[in-house]
Amino acid sequence: MISPTRLASFNDMQDSNFFTQFLNICCEKPVQPNYKEYVSLQRALCEGDVEIDKVIDWVMQDPKGHRMIFEKILFQGRDELSEPIPTELENFFNYIEQKPDWLDQQQIDEAVKFTHRLGINNGFILRDLSLMAGYLYPGFNQPLILTGALKKEAGTRLAETTKWWVDITEPHGLSRLSAGFTSTIYVRFIHALVRRQLKKSDRWDNEVWGIPLNQFDLAMTNLAFSSVVLLGIRALGIWPTKQEAKSFLHFWRYVGWLMGIEEKWLIQSEPEGWRLLY
């Protein structure tokens, strides 16, 4: 197994200093990964999104025609398809339309209400903390740099990300044919296309970065909208209740699941997020 050089060595990650000691107290356990966790990090940097990658393999057999079929089912529903649904798409849509056993709709609804109560503070945190921190994170910004998304389309990308966030945080914004649900799956689809494109590019260095848009980087992006936001609102003097924070993380756990992140990287508590960020 390749160990991308961007990942610090296991020994280096065991270093103890004031920062790690502080996090150990906050997390109530060592923030440094044990060896099993470290190996999982190595693997995550080399793993994509198996479910949607299968769809992309099928789409590329007839890019224009197959993409039209995928988008029709995604945005209109499978009942609108006149011909039999291809096996690859049937398997994928069966998977994403069947909600995970752990999903609690009440917590989703509570998280949406909490998000709305934050009002304009959402914009400050997402713009000045979550997105800016994300753009400073090398694993996140390398695909953006190589595809030109930061240089040529930064404003468009910011607008699209904001629109997506607004859509998913609407009441029932994650129901099957809602704009939030469909745009989330479409982003997942685009991620897979970019991953396929960059994997073939001479400009992408697997030995340094792992594969493009890998599981770890997707999980870090999800944390920028969940754990980092909770830190940001506290910095503004807004202290959520334990239940509000729990529901908020649950909401983003489901969004991350829809986005193709494996469940082992979807946090259920803030300390889990802090350890993963470390």
Predicted regions and their residues:
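Mature, function-bearing regions of proteins
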Residues: 1-222, 226-278
